Amino acid sequence: MVSLLPPQSDVTLPGSTRLEGEPQGDLMQAPGLPDSPAPQNKHANFSCSSFVPDGPPERTPSLPPHSPSIASPDPEQIQGHCTAGPGPGSFRLSPSEKYPGFGFEEGPAGSPGRFLKGNHMPFHPYKRHFHEDIFSEAQTAMALDGHSFKTQGALEAFEEIPVDMGDAEAFLPSFPAEAWCNKLPYPSQEHNQILQGSEVKVKPQALDSGPGMYCYQPPLQHMYCSSQPAFHQYSPGGGSYPVPYLGSPHYPYQRIAPQANAEGHQPLFPKPIYSYSILIFMALKNSKTGSLPVSEIYNFMTEHFPYFKTAPDGWKNSVRHNLSLNKCFEKVENKSGSSSRKGCLWALNPSKIDKMQEELQKWKRKDPIAVRKSMAKPEELDSLIGDKREKLGSPLLGCPPPGLAGPGPIRPMAPSAGLSQPLHPMHPAPGPMPGKNPLQDLLGGHAPSCYGQTYPHLSPSLAPSGHQQPLFPQPDGHLELQAQPGTPQDSPLPAHTPPSHGAKLMAEPSSARTMHDTLLPDGDLGTDLDAINPSLTDFDFQGNLWEQLKDDSLALDPLVLVTSSPTSSSMLPPPPAAHCFPPGPCLAETGNEAGELAPPGSGGSGALGDMHLSTLYSAFVELESTPSSAAAGPAVYLSPGSKPLALA
């Protein structure tokens, strides 16, 4: 045991010869007897021994020379301050600071003696036994740097070192953690260097000023410190001497903190915003046969929406109630031959499928982010809901989109590079206009028309239509590029622009998109018109939509007035050669002096009297300045770099 001896003025340190020669037993001596210590200087030696009892009573059993003598000091006698000195292992004590010790029986309230099972027992630290209920109380008094020790069962052989808690940081500040937490034997010289290389300071207060710090240590954990025979001072050279050492794996000088929970909580999937009827509809819609038992519906919901894996079982009751009460589902007989009630299958009511599909799309548009967060595989949402354009061929728009007018969307913005194709007006195919559809009321009575069968390959943005009003407002100096209605088909084509200008059309012929798709972000054509965003439903074509297009950097450039006067056509130079849209028939310019255009094979006799560059769709045109001596006449091109202008 490593402890602090009282000053030499109060305690006499016996040598090894005295240990061997003294008889067994306890020799209790009072102060002032001949064997009492004589006054000496205040510099005491640091020794690997226990305290000396009152007066100073000593117990010197006949033990081997390497065994320490056990003693306990009087509370008023032992004083000192331990520091590492430069001498050969001696530690000097400062008289300015006191180290009050006390006996095991008459100690103050902070003494661990009150935790013993009977204070009348003779003092013997190796024979003290603590029970669990007693030591649990003592554990509250043990603290080092604000942290208590770990405890296991009964403890034996403790030494008490009352220390002020405010000065606990100064207690052996430079000792490495291995010196406290390991029980390995240290070489004498190495351990001496550890002690001498750091200041060992114990700054106590009076015993009645506060609770003390008690260092409990088991008896069998030994270390070897450099010393002469027992009760002698430290020296670099000398024999090794086993003392109980505080640093054991079971009672380390270290902080005892609760272990942090290393397992992070997995993010919980939120409850899907879909109703139970919608979830059942998704399960039945994505089944192979169109009908499922209740157990398979459960499996579908737990597989795609993990919330139901940990949800209370009440959700299964809700599923069963929806199946039995909702008219969108009907029970069908199991064709496998099972007649039990559990073997019945559930299928969709054919008359309610459209309604459920609309409801499904509405919820997806309402909060698509929340829908995907609740799914185990968000990328499967579109496949579970169904093809967004599965109803693209419905009669909502009057006719199916053939050719290039496929499911791909057309965005009336700047086209992608590399898609520039020379574009020429077409002759409208004779035929009645399509009937009125729901979009007519929405768009002011102007319905989109299907392109003529003569040119099925052209984009709907170039399809013919009846006489319409401009889709977008035309500011002063901006006119629509449309021939007057009274022009006969064999009349010359009205002039496009003066020779110094050329017109370019912005379009994207690779794909087409209906106006309904433009208004509905997700492209759902199966929903009612009241499901459209009200901000788009109630807009005025002369206002909000135009402002929105202007916000998208769709700037306008002035256009020269377009007339159908025959005299203006003579100002045009010979037009360039005709170009075609692959793979259908192309429109060729006749090459006559008047700049007339005619379809291929028609010769120079016929020209286009009515030219409509757009119907319900918008086309963006810009004039590009060219030298007045340009040999080529005006032509309509697809150009990704031109600034668009809306025409109707």
From Swiss-Prot:
It comes from Mus musculus (Mouse). GO terms for molecular function: DNA-binding transcription activator activity, RNA polymerase II-specific; sequence-specific DNA binding. It is linked to Defects in FOXN1 are the cause of the nude/severe combined immunodeficiency (SCID) phenotype which is characterized by athymia and hairlessness. Mice develop largely normal hair follicles and produce hair shafts. However, presumably because of a lack of certain hair keratins, the hair shafts that are generated twist and coil in the hair follicle infundibulum, which becomes dilated. Since hair shafts fail to penetrate the epidermis, macroscopic nudity results and generates the grossly misleading impression that nude mice are hairless. The keyword Transmembrane does not apply. PROSITE patterns: FORK_HEAD_2, FORK_HEAD_3. It is found in: Nucleus. Transcriptional regulator which regulates the development, differentiation, and function of thymic epithelial cells (TECs) both in the prenatal and postnatal thymus. Acts as a master regulator of the TECs lineage development and is required from the onset of differentiation in progenitor TECs in the developing fetus to the final differentiation steps through which TECs mature to acquire their full functionality. Residues 54-67, 398-412 have a biased composition (Pro residues). InterPro entries: FH_FOXN1, Fork_head_dom, FOXN1_4, TF_fork_head_CS_2, WH-like_DNA-bd_sf, WH_DNA-bd_sf. It holds the Pfam family Forkhead. Its main location: nucleus. PANTHER family: FORKHEAD BOX PROTEIN N1. Residues 1-95, 392-432, 457-521, 629-648 are annotated as: Disordered. This is Forkhead box protein N1. Gene3D superfamilies: Winged helix-like DNA-binding domain superfamily/Winged helix DNA-binding domain.
